[in-house]
Amino acid sequence: MAAAAVVVPAEWIKNWEKSGRGEFLHLCRILSENKSHDSSTYRDFQQALYELSYHVIKGNLKHEQASSVLNDISEFREDMPSILADVFCILDIETNCLEEKSKRDYFTQLVLACLYLVSDTVLKERLDPETLESLGLIKQSQQFNQKSVKIKTKLFYKQQKFNLLREENEGYAKLIAELGQDLSGNITSDLILENIKSLIGCFNLDPNRVLDVILEVFECRPEHDDFFISLLESYMSMCEPQTLCHILGFKFKFYQEPSGETPSSLYRVAAVLLQFNLIDLDDLYVHLLPADNCIMDEYKREIVEAKQIVRKLTMVVLSSEKLDERDKEKDKDDEKVEKPPDNQKLGLLEALLKVGDWQHAQNIMDQMPPYYAASHKLIALAICKLIHITVEPLYRRVGVPKGAKGSPVSALQNKRAPKQVESFEDLRRDVFNMFCYLGPHLSHDPILFAKVVRIGKSFMKEFQSDGSKQEDKEKTEVILSCLLSITDQVLLPSLSLMDCNACMSEELWGMFKTFPYQHRYRLYGQWKNETYNGHPLLVKVKAQTIDRAKYIMKRLTKENVKPSGRQIGKLSHSNPTILFDYILSQIQKYDNLITPVVDSLKYLTSLNYDVLAYCIIEALANPEKERMKHDDTTISSWLQSLASFCGAVFRKYPIDLAGLLQYVANQLKAGKSFDLLILKEVVQKMAGIEITEEMTMEQLEAMTGGEQLKAEGGYFGQIRNTKKSSQRLKDALLDHDLALPLCLLMAQQRNGVIFQEGGEKHLKLVGKLYDQCHDTLVQFGGFLASNLSTEDYIKRVPSIDVLCNEFHTPHDAAFFLSRPMYAHHISSKYDELKKSEKGSKQQHKVHKYITSCEMVMAPVHEAVVSLHVSKVWDDISPQFYATFWSLTMYDLAVPHTSYEREVNKLKVQMKAIDDNQEMPPNKKKKEKERCTALQDKLLEEEKKQMEHVQRVLQRLKLEKDNWLLAKSTKNETITKFLQLCIFPRCIFSAIDAVYCARFVELVHQQKTPNFSTLLCYDRVFSDIIYTVASCTENEASRYGRFLCCMLETVTRWHSDRATYEKECGNYPGFLTILRATGFDGGNKADQLDYENFRHVVHKWHYKLTKASVHCLETGEYTHIRNILIVLTKILPWYPKVLNLGQALERRVNKICQEEKEKRPDLYALAMGYSGQLKSRKSHMIPENEFHHKDPPPRNAVASVQNGPGGGTSSSSIGNASKSDESGAEETDKSRERSQCGTKAVNKASSTTPKGNSSNGNSGSNSNKAVKENDKEKVKEKEKEKKEKTPATTPEARALGKDSKEKPKEERPNKEDKARETKERTPKSDKEKEKFKKEEKAKDEKFKTTVPIVESKSTQEREREKEPSRERDVAKEMKSKENVKGGEKTPVSGSLKSPVPRSDISEPDREQKRRKIDSHPSPSHSSTVKDSLIDLKDSSAKLYINHNPPPLSKSKEREMDKKDLDKSRERSREREKKDEKDRKERKRDHSNNDREVPPDITKRRKEENGTMGVSKHKSESPCESQYPNEKDKEKNKSKSSGKEKSSSDSFKSEKMDKISSGGKKESRHDKEKIEKKEKRDSSGGKEEKKHHKSSDKHR
């Protein structure tokens, strides 16, 4: 009805009179145009009539309307009555079934209304007799039925009898004699036929009986086929065609009794008659038993039985009795299979196959379920025999092995049999088709199996070597496709049914190895996942294989590997896919099975090894398995077990690696890096290249030598017997062009792990995947570098610019891949030059080496320019960049110690061999020879490396002058060097970490122009927080190694004055005043002296401590883990200072307590480090031993300036300075003034005794003391708004414990002190009194300490290096400072209390910010670290500590009074101006605060708040940050104590941070700054006058 609704819509019926009738007529007219009975329009026409009639039956349309429209339609088609009768017939049946009276009545009315359209005769043919009776077409239906039966019986069933009485036996006797005579003479079938005709006529014989007799004789004389076929053909021309078939069918029926057995002769006669088309197969087929539906039932029953057997076999526990029962059942089943019931269809099929009638045989098999016929052994063997005969000529030509004779197969004499094949093309005709019907039952004929495989192997050789035309190629591709199908459907299933035939397996591999792995793996996949489910026999075999595999695996141990291995081998010959699938599932669950399983696989065939590779890949790619554990932080153990098994099995056995490598590559293409674990294991096991972060320093040192030293001393395990396996791995990579793609994919995937994969994954897992990806890249690259020949490597790896720009390879990875290529190139060029000019002089050799380097590296220098923006090359040259990235540790130094160690080991071995009395002499001699050869190799390698290193150093010596261009500041140069060279490479590998440290030292030793060693080390050590936080676990380990090597160098210089003087004394890297561009004068006064260097080293140690404590305090997993790893690595050289070590120890112990239950891995790391730290405690020294704390001599003065942009970080390294503008007389005066100023400050700040007088800024501070008193309240209000609670961070608390006995004036402010006292336990009264006394003593001591030296202004020195466009600004700044008074004398506190951050005036900060913004901010995190702000604040400052003789108390009081009176007058006048200044500053700060995200601001506040406390604890003179020249306006007096100091310090530090981020200022800010500068200059003039008047007074 659904289809009918499409033809006649319901709307037509509803609107029948209006439009429906017309629409229906129109539709019928269209459908009547095609008169054919086969077309779809004819069916639609029928459907339309049916639909119309059905609407009448349902009552939707009146029968008159229907009969009217049907009358109109009858004109359209002549066959309208017949169609309408068919429709009525269908409706008659439907309405009869419905049993609804109303519908039946409607139907009757419709038919009666249409009687004039359809004749009575037609209706009587097609309608039911009861319907005819109801319509009145017949009187009684019963009579009608009886009459029709009588007529049919008379027509079809009445027998025509022969007159048997007239037939005589003599006639039949003569007939048999005629047919049984000797037919070898000239007797022909025509002659015999004439005699038979005579006998029939003479003896009145029945022709049918004669035909039956002829068939009987034919059955008994099969050798005379041709005669009887000819006779029957002639005889049948006189009979009805059906007669012969009926007689034959009657014969078959005779044998269909329960115990009857059809003779084979009868099958043969029927087969021959079918072959010569004397009878039709369809006519005969109906006479044969069993029926097709019985065959189908039998087939289904076999499948059910097979599944029941599977269920029985998979039962978990069976007793021995049940096992016996099961064996008996198996025997019964076998018996059943051996005795099949008599099946006439199969008997005929066998006969057809024997006579070679393939066409009819095929027709019979098509009637049966797939492979049902072939599952009977006789049929299978018959098909096999037919194939043997058919392929014989081709096999003789291409398949017979050399030297083999073989037994030829005779061809069928039957001309109608399939033609024999002469070429591969002929196989398509019938042979492939025969195999398809044979299926898995080729297992019955192993000889034919081998023949087919050999023919296939020959075809594949021809196919692969064929260079013929396109047409021939297309034909051969079709044959290949057929061959693959036969392999899938016949060969592999047949192998499964063969009983462990290893020879067939090896024979099959001979053909399989010619297929590409894609074809092979597809075949294995079909074999494993589909083949076993399609055949009842294979279902059983699969269950039996799994059952047997379980039995073997349960008993497999290390002790019984051999016998179990043999059983595994035997089982694998036939069903490898099922066996390996089960074995791998067990390995994934129990990793202790890996070793015994690997050892037990030695008895497999080549085909089985290949199947194993496929099964491993399939197990790896299993989508149902989770690759992560439930905690989402670690890789699943099943994947780790499979990876380990992969590495072991691929190393031990000759398995094709192509598929596995391609799988890993495909996974990387898909952005999945889990499976890199497989590649890592395979390379490690097959090539012996280990990647581990736990290498000892001895191993690391050995890795810097040659290949022999690496193999002997660079790895944990001795690398043995990897030559063959590494060669196999190399061949697989090169043959399938996977070497470079894998490298590039890994290099790209490193970032993919973070940005694509890492979104939903746990950070810990992302880090592990990144490390795995990176480590595998390093390992794989190392394998390629050591195993590929120079030609192979150079041919595959493109140039550096192509790698980076086209393949988007990260620069570090690109250079890592290119580095061996450069070394190969240079080496080959050098050898060429040596051969061409045979000069033995060393100098000539060096010259040739340098020439070869220039030839190879010149294109590289050009290529690297495109890697970075042009501005980069203003700081460092492309040559320097390429040199850094192209060299390795092998080029820089010879590991003599390592060579010596390995040689000594060999000597010890040789001595042990000599002492061994049990060893046979032959073996002893052999071992000694091996050790001697190895020793000679090592010594030769060492010598070779020494010569190479000498050549490299000579080359570097010549190159160094062009390395660093003096186009920008040294600070920018160092930034680019660290950003583009050191930091990317130091975390690439452990050996690269050592290389980076040694390279920095080498650049220093070479006295490279424009390279500041001091700046470089300072930038590395100053703040490691962000670097450490952004590392993965392994990167942290490498970064730790890098810092360790850097600290080693620094410690060597620090520990001995002579070493320092020798290696650093007169080196440009340790200049502290960096003069005009390109000038590195050797002025001794510009060099950093030994004592000041020790101060700097202490500062670096302090910075490391501060960063470490910060990371430990964060609570972040990554921060804590990474800093603990780094600290563990640098333990040999840090901490050296006792108080820093104690601070670290306390924090680490706290981590141990906190993480014990929460994060066990952090707890383990912390405990490990804590234990090692305690063991190093005895080597730590007090601070005063680490660096000399007394004031150093004046001539050790130093300052570092960076020229233009000098506002960026530069270290305040010296403590003393030369005075450029004042003589001795001015110095004395300024000393007196600053002393008075200090006294005034101390008096004025009597209300706040906890203030730190060391923040005194200049001699004029005394004049501003009163003003500061008045301003104190305003400042406090500002401070409350800015920071309601003082920022104290955990590291401040950690370090604070070291300095409990420091005087109160060291506290940053009252709130800080209050917080610190809360954290401590309450003190007793005695302790408080003692504390007050100590404070008083310190106050008095402090009053005597005043600095007396004047500093060269920052702007003045900047002008020396500044470009002309910046000089106007510099002049303006200098003039302002001169007006303010150049006699600025920075005051230093006592050595015990270094001053916190200096306060910088607002215009000064803005000016600095402009200058900083003119230079790009380095991308590496160290350049934005907060601790570097200390360096920025202190740029271009000069410090000295000096103790003048104390004045008498009465004089002090007088001078203080006068100064205070005058300062009060001045302060009132300027109070209003300052109030405005403060408001503007406050507004500026709030604007800047908005620019910084709140979380960053908060963190910076905490860090800055800490600095106030932590700097007191450092006790290092280098840490004292002194005010700049422009600080007089803000720091007129420090009488307001530490509150003001810490507040201003916080502000200035925040401003510096913002400026270091490189943000641009608005025009509005610039206008404000200009206004402030004007006000400050006017204020400076007044100050100058005030200074003069105070001088006169004195």
UniProtKB/Swiss-Prot annotation:
Compositional bias annotation for Polar residues: 1416-1425
Subcellular location: Nucleus; Nucleus speckle; Cytoplasm
GO CC annotation terms, alphabetical: chromosome, telomeric region; cytoplasm; nuclear speck; nucleus; THO complex part of transcription export complex
InterPro entries: Tho2, THO_THOC2_C, THO_THOC2_N, THOC2_N
Biased composition (Basic residues): 1584-1594
Stretches of the chain forming a coiled coil according to its record: 896-965, 1464-1491
In-chain residues carrying the UniProt-annotated modification Phosphoserine: S1222, S1390, S1393, S1417, S1450, S1486, S1516
Ranges where the record places region Disordered: 1183-1594
Main location class: nucleus
Annotated motif Nuclear localization signal, positions: 923-928
Superkingdom of this protein's organism: Eukaryota
Protein name per UniProt: THO complex subunit 2
Species this chain originates from: Mus musculus (Mouse)
Lineage, top ranks: Eukaryota, Metazoa, Chordata, Craniata, Vertebrata
Gene label: Thoc2
